[in-house]
Amino acid sequence: MSDLIQNVKTSFEQVLGYAPSHIIQAPGRVNLIGEHTDYNDGFVLPCAINYQTVVAAAKREDNLVRVVSVDYGNAVDEFDITQEITFQQDKMWANYIRGVVKCLLARGYQFSGADISVSGNVPQGAGLSSSAALEVVIGQTFKVLFNLEISQAEIALNGQQAENEFVGCNCGIMDQMISAEGRENHAMLLDCRSLETEAVSMPEDMAVVIINSNKKRGLVDSEYNTRREQCEEAARIFGVKALRDVTIEQFNEKVSELDEMVAKRARHVITENDRTVEAAQALRAHDMKRMGELMAESHASMRDDFEITVKEIDTLVEMVKEVIGEQGGVRMTGGGFGGCIVAIVPPALVDEVKATVEAKYQAATGLKESIYVCQAKNGAGLVEVL
């Protein structure tokens, strides 16, 4: 993170002409288990990672917000918080920031303007929530600068609202919530219905290894929407608000009445919810053998029932599983049709996992992977006062 801090400080001073007063960060995240459960009112188990979005900031006495984006060549966006805050077609990055500020104002928070320089190293397009980290770090920045009475959960909800309503992208609450509330050496069990969170301790030295297949994700939006509709149809047939409310026993009694495809989709969600709750118990007990079994079952369910994995992802999972055996777990993470796998790996095996994948994956698929070795880290907060 030290490079990021240096970059935002330097760009702040160069572009805005004086020194910032505060450094604030918010992390990206990876979901260890609980896939496609969020919009079914279910459970997820993400952790925050040591890839962050970092801000250098200072408050202004007037109503102007000026933002410098280090990652877009020190491009500047400027707006007045007393005027209508509008969507910028030609500056997509700026809309996340504008949306967060607009939503904070709509929620009744009072503050003046600010100068902000922002940079991040959360890989974009890898499904590690670079956009949520940006939304959360901006909310956190206004909290810090103006001592706002806002909870971490509300910073997360405000970021989700900005993405849904201002940016115009539908997302659940998981990404913002873990970025806002993460804890070092812990995952977070999130109930997507009640928004209750529970910190779940992880074995301290465990590495969280994320491997991007770099398989271009085709069809992902249309297939995602289809899966969502199939889940909603199943919930209607069971007469419940969401599949969260269906037990596997109820499912088995009624399975013959369901369309075969809808049945497979519903079975994934129902069993995945149970797995996620059990995974939190296994992780807390530091039972990596059971955690590994649950992650393997999750992957098989995504592959066979939800049908969202691809050959490249299945290949990566098998390669990693051969190395870690019962000492950790591995599965696809994210929306599917490409993207990343996540593995919980004992430190002694990290190099072997990397070496195996580097030696075999490209030969098997023709694609070159990207490997990120992470730890579970703290959520958003103040890094330093300058």
Curated annotation (Swiss-Prot):
Binding annotation for substrate: 35-38, 224
Sequence positions that bind ATP: 69, 125-131
Domain of life: Bacteria
GO MF: ATP binding; galactokinase activity; magnesium ion binding
Catalytic activity as recorded in UniProt: alpha-D-galactose + ATP = alpha-D-galactose 1-phosphate + ADP + H(+)
UniProt-listed GO biological process terms: galactose metabolic process
Sorted UniProt keywords: ATP-binding, Carbohydrate metabolism, Cytoplasm, Galactose metabolism, Kinase, Magnesium, Metal-binding, Nucleotide-binding, Transferase
Pathway named in the protein's UniProt entry: Carbohydrate metabolism; galactose metabolism
E.C. number: 2.7.1.6
Positions contributing to Mg(2+) binding: 131, 163
Site-annotated residues for Transition state stabilizer: 29
UniProt GO cellular component terms: cytosol
Subcellular location: Cytoplasm
Catalytic site positions: 175 (proton acceptor)
Record's keyword annotation contains Magnesium: yes
Main location group: cytoplasm
Family per similarity comment: Belongs to the GHMP kinase family. GalK subfamily.
Protein's job: Catalyzes the transfer of the gamma-phosphate of ATP to D-galactose to form alpha-D-galactose-1-phosphate (Gal-1-P).
The protein's name: Galactokinase
Gene responsible for this protein: galK
